[in-house]
Amino acid sequence: MKKSPDVFVIAFSLIILAAILTWVLPGGAYEREQVKVGESVREIVKPGSFHTIPSKPQIGSIFTAPAHGFLKLGSIIAFIFIVGGAFNILNDTGAIAAGIGQLVQMLQKRTYLIIPIVMTVFSFFGGAFGMCEEAMPFALILVPMAISLGYDSIVGVCMSFVAAGVGFAAGFMNPFTVQIAQGIAGVPALSGLGYRLVVWAVVTAVTIAWVMAYAARIKANPQRSIMFELDQARRAELEKSAAQHQRFTWRDAMCLVILGIAIAGLIVGVTTLGWYMLELAGLFLAMGVASGLVAAMGPNRVAKSFIAGAKDIAGAALIVGFAGGIIVILENGQILDTILYGMASVTSRLGGVLAAQSMFLLQTVLNFFIPSGSTKAVLTMPLLAPLADLSGVTRQTVVLAYQLGTGFTSMIIPTSGVTVGTMALAKIPYEKWVRWHWPMQVVFAVLSLLALIWPALSGWS
């Protein structure tokens, strides 16, 4: 069997490709202006202001791009290191293994209910609050749970990362995509909520059905899993840990209470206090230290466990830096606006349903180069909203095309620090994730194209 290239080989190859593009494509830029969107001021592009500028080839920056990527995505990298260390402390307490054992005993033959319940919750958080990076640490809980239930690590990642990603993409009130895009497009905040709820419900249901069908196949025959060999070692570790912690003690219960408090703190902090990566890193660090002390591990053992966890997750932090390097090359080469201008020019020639669907495809392609949803909103919505008026579709439809094109492919592109970071946390090689996940991306694309037909034909606003 031909061996797939390592994720670092893929990332560095993309850095080289991005550098070559800075030689091939002409430099270009839109003029920017500051506008108030909601309670914040954002810098958006001015329609019709594109002009060529001298290109800045980045061939000489190929080897410095990863370091610049570390600086650009430093908060995510710090988050990964601290979360990896903190959850390793929690894992070493044995509370996770003991808790999973208790859960399996309680549910007995109803363990299949865990998948739809957990996925619905994460999808709701993605759709309502824009949960994305915040879902990363849950892979460290749900992957071991999935393996203990007889599934594989893919199912564990789907329960949190994919579910939150689907909710983020089809979000009905996502503050980082829907609300920003509506503000820039001049559409009333949270308008069109009814149809967005329908789209979210359909996409979430299809995703849950897909994952449950896959999980049933793996439980019936574990060797069908693309992760079978890699999961075997983790399964053995979980069984060993469960054997060592056959009794569910009060210390285990207290550690799980601390975990629950941390999760509640995450929800409150993100939704009401404006917490982001650094605050959440501090929250999980406190959780790890507290659980270690409650489990009577002692300060030195807690420190050693934290270092071991951070060391184990170093590859995740490194690959995030490489992914950031790709974006740095494109930004410094001043070709992102050129790419945006070229794609918008193609979209402007279409009308009706084709216009709406082409805008979705435009956002999908741009997502590789600009994986940030809010950044893409301020870049593309000032251009596409006026195009909507000329193409015979509503601006509300353009917002929907934007959010669908922005969200789904974020779960597979190598330029997303969240994606490559989550895969590393879950110990799923990126190339295996792509092999497993790409058919789901095809389904998401078809659902998105279908979801845009009614709004384009009905004048949805």
Tell where the protein language model's regions lie, with residue ranges.
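Membrane-core helix-loop-helix motifs of multi-pass transport proteins
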Residues: 1-6, 10, 139-229, 245-253, ...
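Long, contiguous bundles of hydrophobic transmembrane helices that form the permeation core
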Residues: 2-4, 8, 33-41, 194-305, ...
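Core transmembrane alpha-helical segments of multi-pass membrane transporters/permeases
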Residues: 7-16, 42-97, 275-338
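Short helix-coil transition sites and intra-membrane helix breaks within transmembrane domains
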Residues: 72-76, 87-98, 126-137, 168-173, ...
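Hydrophobic alpha-helical transmembrane segments of multi-pass integral membrane proteins
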Residues: 81, 110-141, 320-330, 345-386, ...
